[in-house]
Amino acid sequence: MNVIDTDDLEKHTPMMRQYLTMKAEHHDMLLFYRMGDFYELFYDDAKRASELLGISLTARGKSGGDPIPMAGLPYHAVEGYLAKLVQIGQSVAICEQIGDPATSKGPVERKVVRIVTPGTLTDEALLQERQDNLLAAVYQGKIGFGYATLDVSSGRFVIAELDTRESLEAELQRTNPVEILYSEDFGELGLLNGFKGKRRRPEWEFDYDTSIKLLLTQFGTKDLHGFGIADARLSLQAAGCLMQYVKDTQRTALPHINAITRFNQTDSIVLDAATRRNLELTQNLAGGRDNTLAAVLDNTATPMGSRMLQRWIHQPLRDPKHIKARQQAVTELLDTTAHEGLHEQLKALGDIERIMARLALRTARPRDFARLRQALGLLPELQQSLSTLSAPHTTQLRQHIGEFPAEQALLERAIVDNPPMLIRDGGVIREGYNSELDEWRGLSEGASDYLVQLEAREKERTGINTLKVGYNRVHGYYIEVSRLQSSQVPLNYQRRQTLKNMERYITPELKEYEEKVLSSQGKALALEKQLWEQLFDLILPKLHELQAFARAAAELDVLSNFAERAETLGYTCPELSQDIGVQIEAGRHPVVERVSQTPFIANPVTLHNQRRMLIVTGPNMGGKSTYMRQVALITLMAHIGCFVPADRALIGPIDRIFTRIGASDDLASGRSTFMVEMTETANILHNASASSLVLMDEIGRGTSTYDGLSLAWSAAEYLAQQVGAMTLFATHYFELTQLPELMAGVYNVHLDAIEHDDTIAFMHAVQEGAASKSYGLQVAALAGVPNKVIKAAKHKLQQLESRDHQAEGTRTPIQSLLALPEPVENPALTKLSNINPDNLTPKQALDLLYELKRLS
């Protein structure tokens, strides 16, 4: 029941009227409606929750004459159910009872106090600790797109102006948001396939003027020039929608969102969506994290360091100055072995970044404050460790870490050593922090002694040996006497409860004491909650400095991690060159060498101005794809400041890395494997430059032999002669090995293999020159193809080779066929192709005929 007609509300009970009114305000999400110890869901929400969560679907009487579908879940287990829902992209509005049932004449007053969506999570239990949790918004203009992302759990706010559909696709792949807001007229919904939390928003939420006002109010500035984003119109519209959505869902101030940055593609190496996917940077082809570059490089000490590392991997730097600053820091950490001590110190800091976000939102829990206290207490020791380091970048980070002795001392005085999870039942504020709280607690905590004394006194006074004094939460304090001795109780005993073998009583004295104790408990809890809220006010003035500390600690963690990885995995520091080129000695694939059961064979690569393209041949299973990927990964690692798996690496400037490796049908978009392959190829041919690194694997294999060969030849020729990109071009078309004879800068290399009888041994070693054969039948035999089929294939191969040998004398050489001169354009045909006959008058058509006759 998503749309509520208010005229029909009178048909329902008062409680259901209340529910339906609230549901109408939150029609696009599940409504958890608190009733006692349960959250109830009704109508379509109940059916959906039953399906998604596996909870029972029942009915609750009738309202408006029809049975009401209902499903419920206990309030104390809600976090587990919320975790399941947000993982599948579902949003939830949580409606709590805020009125007192005892004093309510109608339905208990209720209010939606919390909205949980996949992209606005801050609760530790609902977040993946080593992954960013990004909310994104996208807006489509007449030309280009505006894109904005916000991590509410850290406050990181980034926008990007994107010119093309391909660049938006790459950004979606890079940022991998868990929730995406898009406008009603967004025209590229196909790009959002595969993302779970999609939210269509009204066009007015993307209004430019409204967006600017929202952002200025949030940042407390007069304009946006200081952020360098004033001209980013489309992305500011996306950012405004995003900001409004967060305000609507969080319903509180957002002081930790205090800056916004612009992602400029020119600052980092551009990686399109296909490249990120094919290189398996942070996600493997199956969607997991195993056997990815991040899995190998990530031995960080903190969750916030792990998240930063993944951002670095997806955003390799182009500025050599920034790369060298990271390299110098890593080198010093490695040479001094300082990384070993830093790892342990940083590990004890925990996830300060997300703790600070919860603090800013005032949703931090007692244990968050305890962790913050612990982290602040470690800073003097951390500062001491950093004081011995002199690398400029490390020194700069140390300045941001600072020390917070006043805040650490405050938390030491205020919070008990091992606080409970929630403030709800108290027990969080340390004794001695507040004298009034100690006084109220003293009254309540002295109750045990009082009850012991009262019991002894009453036993002596009455002579009843079964008399006991006790307490329970339902009936309060009581004096208990056995049924047999109940006739002996004094006249001032008032019966409170009758049990099977016992009677329970209350006396005026005990009643008075009960009221005093319960009053003191209530006052103590109320005061403790008040003191708890004041702690936020006392810590928040240091929010920005604490956020800077968290960012600096995360970066130190990544740099320290790079040093440890270099030492453990045998990596070397790559050299940066001003000249275009990639030269690697004994390079290794960082992932394959870690998972391989056999020693990895290291291989070189040399690309420079006079050697721009390598035609890579060799058998299937010979290692061509691994070799190509390792070149790209080593290049990328060098540009994030990481050491690389090679004996030596000299890397020149790179603007883009392209890969066309492997493909499968894109069923969602209705594209065949060959269409996917050609789309990726077209993107490379349109966008690659002389500073790009291009990996092309098996172009043309998805169509007929001559079609495929022609496409592969032409693509290689275009890259070598028109683009001049540094290219590794793997192929099984041996005709392409003739390219070096026809074009300067093109060379053959091959992956070696040794054949013995009917078996083959892959050497995985790269050698100069072309491969002699493809070994396809031997590989098929290794794969388990039946021997009968292999024998038939050998016979057929001999027939084909014999026929080809006989025809050699009459065939035109391949270089003559494929290296034909460019076709000369016919001016008459060119003119004709540009004509729109619907726009010609009879006179213009006649004049055009004469002109075409002249041109022909």
UniProtKB/Swiss-Prot annotation:
The protein's matches in InterPro entries, at most eight in alphabetical order, are given as: DNA_mismatch_repair_MutS (IPR005748), DNA_mismatch_repair_MutS-lik_N (IPR007695), DNA_mismatch_repair_MutS/MSH (IPR017261), DNA_mismatch_repair_MutS_C (IPR000432), DNA_mismatch_repair_MutS_clamp (IPR007861), DNA_mismatch_repair_MutS_core (IPR007696), DNA_mismatch_repair_MutS_N (IPR016151), DNA_mismatch_repair_MutS_sf (IPR036187)
In alphabetical order, the GO MF annotations are:
ATP binding; ATP-dependent DNA damage sensor activity; damaged DNA binding; mismatched DNA binding
Is DNA-binding one of the keywords? yes
Where on this chain does ATP bind?
618-625
Q: Name one GO cellular component term.
A: cytosol
Which terms are listed as keywords in the entry? ATP-binding, DNA damage, DNA repair, DNA-binding, Nucleotide-binding
What job does this protein perform? This protein is involved in the repair of mismatches in DNA. It is possible that it carries out the mismatch recognition step. This protein has a weak ATPase activity.
- Which NCBIfam families does the protein's record reference? mutS1, PRK05399.1
Protein's name according to its UniProt entry: DNA mismatch repair protein MutS
